[in-house]
Amino acid sequence: MSVKRVFLATKKDLTIGAVCDVKTKQASSYKHNHVTTQQGLAGSREVALSAIVNLMKGFDTKELEAPVQVFCVSSVADMINNQSYKYWLISGKKNDGTDVDANEMKLWKEFHKLMSKNGMYFIFKSLNDANFRGTPKFNQAEIKYNKFYYDWAWSAIHKIYPQGPATPDMDFGIVE
């Protein structure tokens, strides 16, 4: 029997993460590429959702003794937890009235089908929830465990897609 946690960081066309077994303290890396035509937040959301669908398809739920905590980008975690993706499935439209991208809609339909079958085995949380700061009054070992994999996932992504400078160059070419 096992207790699993999944940490998924997404940037551009790539999701990198770790699938961890809390009891055995073992983890395996996870990498998923997905090409999207969408830009910005919508593109990131589609790439992350593609990774989640791919992961859920291959997940063996028979050996679990607790639901799998999946930490992913907040744009996906929020839509799942608020169940707002169901509005998209029914109407085919976003809140602003524009059509949902066809590829993303296909992924949401597949996700919904997987959740209908195995939804009780998965809990979705924002990856930022794994990054506790300070010393909150929670289980410190669990906080360190989550923080380790949060940091690991983002550092793996940033090796491929480096972050911008720590302090942005604010020189806008203004000559006085």
Protein language model annotation of sequence segments:
Residues M1-V47, K57-F59, Y161, D171-E176:
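RNase H-like nuclease fold core
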Residues A9-K11, R133-K137, A141, Y149:
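Acidic, metal-ion-coordinating active-site neighborhood of RNase H-like domains
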Residues V53-N139:
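RNase H catalytic domain
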Residues L41-E46, S50, D101-M105:
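Conserved phosphate-coordination/catalytic loops
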Residues S44-A48, I52, F138, Y150:
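Hydrophobic alpha-helical segments
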Residues Y30, K93-T98, D151-W152:
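Glycine-rich loops and low-complexity Gly/Arg-rich segments
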Residues L127, N139-E176:
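Charged phosphate-binding loop/patch that engages nucleotide di/tri-phosphates or the phosphate backbone
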Residues T24-Q26, W88-S91, I143-Y145:
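Short, low-complexity, polar/charged sequence segments that are solvent-exposed and flexible
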